[in-house]
């Protein structure tokens, strides 16, 4: 290794210490690593790795990557790429608008590790702040759409539309296999819908929205406002199509709904769209939170997360994720969707935008946008230029002008570019000018001069040109939360009050197995708010985004070097989306060979729930493969099922190391077997943190792999998103990666439709992973993998005498995570894995992953970023909890199995200071069971949440303030 923690001070190379970041990222220095190795019986790292990682999979060469760069040098190099991005003022529209994120929200949410380092709120008691923010988001969506319920975000508008189509088929009573799509939808939305429909066997019929009245469709999707900015009243059309048992979905601009009649008022069953306009930068396509609102009767068919109101064991109002039995981690191939992570951080930002501005503020912003567009249209109309014609009289923000000829349209378009403005071309002679929250007086002068040769000032009076029949008459955002925090002090304190209710990685380790909660370094996060990365439209002209594309290309090369694959697609904007894109490439590949019937997907029974859910979305038949007693794929069963389904075998989905936390010795044999029978190997990259620099998935036989940039490559989890799931693939699959109708991908075939709304998915967070790889360098990345493996084995060794470690490799070693078995303890004492998870909160820790991949277990993944001291605190907590369980069993000090600190956990401050303490253990035992807790106590804000009550009494909107009193 070329990295030294203590470089010499007699050379400038040593004094500069370019690899310093490596030891900022790693939790243990060389001396501490030696202690960890010694504790598990090793003198050096090499011997430990030889016992842990099977020799047949090892990569015995350096990664083809540069050496580590310092934080300053990496930022400087990224700055040179950013400087090669031209940030024109965007008037493109097409689903993306410039915004102004309030500074108080940017600094205290987007840039705050208390918000962005948290995990999906499965442990509700230590996630009440994030859950409340998501409930606010849902309330915004409910108010603006007029529907009864809303989810806690989807990935983007286009994938939300595809989910709406799938939901329509589940809910509709029509037996039709046709889905109608309004020809006024955005091109990227239709692109993703076409992708999704194909493998379900649904026919997508595109036409004028009025034509939907006469057909037989299981569902219909209408755009409101249309791609040309036009506003149409859909009431009559919706009423007509519903008579034919057609389920109606309306895609709506969230900002327009502040002024316009709601989709529910027009009869819609579902309303969906993007909330990007609520303060989220365009970011070259993302990330942004899509919204999805629906009726109460359809709640069990809706995709994605839903936050609901419940109560805790003390009878207090508490929030939780509701109706989880619909989701992939429980229902697997029967799930409504393969959605795992969504866009929680972005949903929280959008919801806070509404909280900060309130109903009056958002109405002022929406009215200003519309008034700008109206004033601009008036200038064009009053110019009396026969060449210029305003196409639509009823619009919200976009004015479409027919220039009479392609020549004039081109001239205006190019002149706009020359003075720093981007317009949008619609056909040969039409231009669209989309106004936004950022439009100002100077813009108005320049834009009017471009079209009518004379600059015009804004008129004194702001005019609403929409007919009154289009305008909403009901009140919105009436809940107190939207009417209480309009000064910065009040907003600042509200945000802080929510942050303090949540346990994130700025408080303690989050050792969730299969989730890789590692450091999200500050220097990695800085570039996401640079205007060059934040404020670029995804459909901006290519010559303006040279630096952006260079950064993405550079990241692709980094990922190719790490994985060994020939090409990488950056479009999937989550791990689940990456799975979908990977299987999509496999199916398209088989079709290119004329093997359209290769539709069987073999999946080990230990697989992530997203795997079978994704396979079903691709129209594949899931065949489950057994695992043996050691947690490995049962080779005999795999062989038998490969032979049985040989003629139809499409793919094997496999995770490596396995979800059981071990390196399977036979992975090459497994891949060879699948290839022998004509199938392709899809590798789930969830556990890639055990691979980097140690092995290459392409080398062991994988054909395609998705990479969770929000796990292995340091994009933060954001409390449940954003994520990125790019796929690496071998050359024979590269032509079949997702393309994009508006921004073609270099190697993809023209007819390969998209999986995400934007060509590069959530592009604005890609600099995070670029920075991580650049600052770690080839040697640092390998060191990270080594330490991730070491930390997991240290935890396993320390706990094995207290809880059985369920699976190990042939030398007794685990990979980067370990599974401890709680079932023997439960059989002996009745104490469950859930009791331990809740009690860990009293010790200041988030629970490891519960009951996956084996029910009644905890899966622990400590990552390389955790120090030995933090590991020891966590270990001592679990040892103490075991002692508490045994004390309850023994009945010591009047403890019983029905009344002890575990079954009553977590303990809130309110419980501990209550005047009447009725428990058989002390208040100190409840709240401060170990000495270290006194210096950094985290108080859960609610007691144990009643899950059953929440699902039986589903409430997904903001409760009244009295509920919290």
Swiss-Prot record:
Cysteine pairings via disulfide bonds: none
Any one GO BP annotation for this protein: glycine decarboxylation via glycine cleavage system
Reactions it catalyzes: N(6)-[(R)-lipoyl]-L-lysyl-[glycine-cleavage complex H protein] + glycine + H(+) = N(6)-[(R)-S(8)-aminomethyldihydrolipoyl]-L-lysyl-[glycine-cleavage complex H protein] + CO2
Keywords from the named record: Oxidoreductase, Pyridoxal phosphate
Listed EC numbers: 1.4.4.2
Modified positions (N6-(pyridoxal phosphate)lysine) in chain numbering: 711
Molecular function in Gene Ontology: glycine binding; glycine dehydrogenase (decarboxylating) activity; pyridoxal phosphate binding
Cofactor(s) listed: pyridoxal 5'-phosphate
Pfam families (UniProt xref): Aminotran_5, GcvP2_C, GDC-P
Enzymatic class: oxidoreductase
GO CC list: cytosol; glycine cleavage complex
Subunit structure, interactors included: The glycine cleavage system is composed of four proteins: P, T, L and H.
Family: Belongs to the GcvP family.
Cited function: The glycine cleavage system catalyzes the degradation of glycine. The P protein binds the alpha-amino group of glycine through its pyridoxal phosphate cofactor; CO(2) is released and the remaining methylamine moiety is then transferred to the lipoamide cofactor of the H protein.
Identification of the protein by name: Glycine dehydrogenase (decarboxylating)
Species for this entry: Psychrobacter arcticus (strain DSM 17307 / VKM B-2377 / 273-4)
Gene: gcvP
């Amino acid at each position: 290794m070329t990295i030294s923690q203590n470089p010499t001070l007699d050379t400038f190379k040593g004094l500069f210490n370019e690899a310093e970041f490596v030891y900022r990222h790693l939790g243990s220095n060389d001396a501490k690593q030696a202690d960890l190795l010694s504790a598990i019986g090793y003198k050096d790292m090499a011997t430990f790795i030889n016992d842990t990682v099977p020799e047949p999979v090892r990569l015995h060469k350096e990664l083809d990557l540069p050496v580590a760069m310092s934080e300053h040098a990496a930022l400087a190099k990224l700055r040179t790429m950013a400087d090669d991005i031209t940030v024109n003022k965007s008037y493109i529209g097409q689903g993306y608008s410039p915004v102004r994120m309030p500074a108080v929200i940017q600094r205290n949410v987007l840039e705050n590790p208390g918000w962005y380092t948290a995990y999906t709120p499965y442990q509700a008691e230590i996630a009440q702040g994030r859950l409340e923010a998501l409930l606010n988001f849902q309330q915004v969506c409910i108010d603006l759409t007029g529907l009864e319920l809303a989810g806690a975000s989807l990935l983007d508008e286009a994938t939300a539309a595809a989910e709406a189509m799938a939901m329509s088929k589940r809910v509709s009573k029509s037996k039709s296999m046709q889905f109608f799509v309004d020809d006024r939808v955005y091109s990227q939305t239709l692109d993703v819908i076409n992708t999704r429909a194909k493998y379900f066997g649904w026919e997508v019929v595109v036409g004028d929205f009025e034509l939907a009245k006469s057909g037989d469709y299981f569902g219909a999707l209408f755009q409101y406002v249309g791609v040309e900015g036009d506003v149409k009243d859909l009431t009559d059309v919706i009423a007509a199509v519903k008579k034919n048992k057609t389920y109606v979905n309306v895609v709506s601009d969230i900002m327009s709904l502040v002024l316009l009649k709601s989709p529910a008022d027009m009869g819609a069953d579902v309303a969906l769209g993007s909330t990007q306009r609520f303060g989220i930068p365009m970011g070259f396509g993302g990330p942004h939170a899509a919204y999805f609102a629906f009726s109460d009767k359809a709640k069990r068919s809706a995709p994605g997360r839903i936050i609901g109101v419940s109560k805790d064991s003390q009878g207090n109002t508490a929030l939780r994720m509701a109706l989880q039995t619909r989701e992939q981690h429980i229902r697997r191939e029967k799930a409504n969707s393969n959605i795992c992570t969504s866009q929680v951080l972005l949903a929280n930002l959008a919801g806070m935008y509404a909280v900060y501005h309130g109903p009056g503020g958002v109405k002022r912003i929406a009215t200003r946008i519309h008034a700008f567009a109206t004033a601009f249209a008036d200038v064009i109309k009053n110019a009396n230029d026969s060449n210029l014609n305003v196409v639509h009289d009823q619009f919200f923000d976009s004015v479409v002008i027919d220039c009479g000829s392609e020549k004039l349209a081109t001239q205006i378009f190019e002149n706009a570019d020359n003075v720093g403005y981007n317009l949008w071309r619609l056909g040969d002679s039409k231009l669209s000018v989309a106004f936004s929250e950022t439009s100002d007086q100077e813009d108005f002068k320049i834009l009017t001069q471009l079209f009518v040769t004379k600059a015009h000032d804004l008129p004194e009076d702001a005019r609403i040109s929409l007919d009154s029949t289009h305008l909403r008459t009901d009140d919105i955002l009436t809940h107190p939360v939207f009417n209480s925090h309009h000064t910065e002090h009040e907003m600042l304190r509200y945000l802080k009050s929510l942050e303090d209710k949540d346990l994130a990685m700025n408080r303690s380790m989050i050792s969730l197995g299969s989730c890789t909660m590692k450091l999200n370094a500050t220097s990695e996060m800085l570039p996401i708010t640079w205007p060059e990365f934040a404020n670029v439209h995804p459909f901006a002209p290519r010559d303006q985004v040279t630096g952006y594309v260079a950064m993405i290309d550079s990241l692709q090369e980094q990922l190719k070097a790490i994985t060994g694959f020939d090409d990488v697609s950056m479009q999937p904007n989550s791990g689940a989306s990456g799975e979908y894109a990977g299987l999509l490439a496999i199916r398209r590949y088989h079709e290119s060979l004329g093997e359209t019937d290769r539709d069987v997907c073999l999946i080990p029974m230990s697989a992530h729930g997203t795997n079978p859910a994704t396979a079903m979305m691709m129209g594949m038949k899931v065949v489950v493969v057994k695992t043996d007693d050691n947690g490995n794929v049962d080779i005999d069963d795999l062989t038998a099922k490969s032979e049985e389904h040989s003629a139809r075998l499409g793919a094997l989905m496999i995770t490596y190391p396995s979800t059981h936390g071990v390196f399977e010795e036979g992975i090459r044999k497994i891949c060879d077997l699948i290839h022998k029978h004509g199938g392709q190997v899809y590798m789930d990259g969830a556990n890639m943190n055990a691979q980097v620099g140690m092995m290459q998935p392409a080398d062991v036989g994988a054909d395609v792999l998705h990479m969770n940039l929000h796990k292995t490559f340091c994009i933060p989890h954001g409390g449940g998103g954003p994520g990125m799931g790019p796929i690496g693939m071998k050359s024979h699959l590269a032509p079949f990666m997702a393309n994009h109708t508006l921004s073609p991908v270099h190697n993809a075939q023209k007819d390969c439709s998209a999986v995400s709304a934007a060509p590069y998915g959530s592009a604005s967070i890609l600099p995070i992973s670029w920075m991580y790889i650049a600052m770690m360098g080839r040697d640092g990345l390998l060191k990270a993998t080594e330490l991730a493996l070491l930390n997991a084995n240290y935890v396993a060794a320390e706990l094995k005498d207290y809880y059985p470690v369920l699976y190990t490799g042939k030398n007794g070693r685990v990979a980067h995570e370990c599974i401890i078995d709680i079932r023997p303890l439960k059989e002996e004492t009745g104490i469950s894995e859930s009791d331990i998870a809740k009690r860990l909160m009293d010790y200041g820790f988030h629970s490891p992953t519960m009951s996956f991949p084996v029910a009644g277990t905890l899966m622990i993944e400590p990552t390389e970023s955790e120090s030995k001291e933090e590991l020891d605190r966590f270990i001592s907590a679990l040892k103490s909890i075991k002692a508490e369980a045994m004390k309850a069993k023994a009945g010591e000090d009047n403890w019983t199995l029905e009344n002890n600190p575990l079954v009553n956990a977590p303990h809130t401050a309110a419980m501990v200071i209550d005047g009447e303490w009725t428990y058989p253990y002390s208040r100190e035992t409840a709240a401060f069971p170990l000495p270290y807790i006194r210096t950094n106590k985290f108080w859960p804000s609610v007691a144990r949440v009643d899950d059953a009550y929440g699902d039986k009494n589903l409430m997904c909107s903001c409760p009244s303030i009295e509920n919290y009193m």
